[in-house]
Amino acid sequence: MNKQELLHMIKQSNRKRLLQRLFLAIPAALAVYFLIRTDGNIWVGFAIIGGVLLATRYFLSHEADAISRLSEQDQVKRVVTLQYHLDFLFITLLALVNPLAIRIMEWSWIPAVLIGGALLYILWAQEKLDQQIRWLDPEQPTRREIRRF
């Protein structure tokens, strides 16, 4: 299969999972609300966000497995898996650390700087990993190409 056929196949698969991802957004927003609220019980937010993070981890690992199967090289498979681990790390950072930092430091700019710095670092790391994939296997679709297609 050439790169365009692989991209088309990935896009069809992502459309099937879109509804599942949208259903995760509602409990995630509710959990962040409970984590930020200073007068409520924080454990409700932890329970909800824990379930959302487990489901997100399942979906991301399933997607990483599907995309890494497109290449026969072990190094490419490791890089693809690492990219999805970074995505999960950033989602966890957004879901747990940021609301708790906002809860503790209500009127501070520190949580925004932490999240902004983490976002820039992860975007930089993703770009470097995409470059490595292009170098290892030119026919393997990169994350950027998958998002654009």
Placement of each model-derived feature along the sequence:
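Hydrophobic alpha-helical transmembrane segments and immediately flanking/interface helices
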Residues: I104-Q132
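Juxtamembrane "helix-exit" motif on the non-cytosolic side of transmembrane helices
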Residues: V32-G40, V97-E106
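Membrane-water interface of transmembrane alpha-helices
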Residues: G51-L70, W124-I133
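N-terminal first transmembrane alpha-helix
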Residues: M1-E63
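Short membrane-interface loop/juxtamembrane segments of multi-pass integral membrane proteins
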Residues: L6, A66-F88, I146
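Hydrophobic core segments of alpha-helical transmembrane domains in multi-pass membrane proteins
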Residues: W43-L54, T92-N98, S108-L119
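Hydrophobic alpha-helical membrane segments
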Residues: K77-I102, G117-I122
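Short, highly charged, low-complexity non-transmembrane loops/tails of multi-pass membrane proteins
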Residues: Q132-F149
